[in-house]
Amino acid sequence: MSGARIKAAPVRKTVRVNAAPERAFDVFTAHFDAWWPKSHHIGKADMKQAVIEPHAGGRWYEKDVDGSECDWGTVLVWEPPHRVVLSWKINAKFEIDETVGSEVEVRFIAEAGGITRVELEHRIDAADADTMRSMVDAPNGWTAIMDEYRRAVSA
């Protein structure tokens, strides 16, 4: 069944940060470049900057040191400070693939004591969904990335 799309079980990660939802959302989106690992890029050149444009229909992408840009997907939902949903157009070879129908949804939920629970869900819908799920659920995938985010909120 070459090219058939598969839906894998979603990858879910949760972190709690000592910040209001407004700050948690702002660090995740407006300060995305401050915490996203530079090693996690798809361009041929090293990544210079990671960007999430602050509106539905915006891009999320990387700017590389050679001046090139690589789109990762688009902003599907922009609901500050509660939720952002991003399309994920990257396959398991870490190449742009418009046939990938995956989404990354991040929710920011206020809890007692000034804590925000940040819930990330990566819904994978692609021909290589099982491989992609294994990669993004690996220790250096969303777990490590969300740890970087948590540290940035605390800084």
Task: Name each model-derived stretch.
Residues 1-47:
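Hydrophobic ligand-binding cavity/cleft-lining segments
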Residues 22, 54-55, 61-63, 74, ...:
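Charge-dense, helix-prone N-terminal extensions
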Residues 24-28, 60, 75, 86, ...:
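Hydrophobic pocket/interface hotspot
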Residues 29-33, 80, 147:
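Solvent-exposed alpha-helix faces
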Residues 50-51, 56, 65-113, 123:
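Hydrophobic-ligand binding "helix-grip"
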Residues 124-155:
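A conserved amphipathic terminal alpha-helix motif
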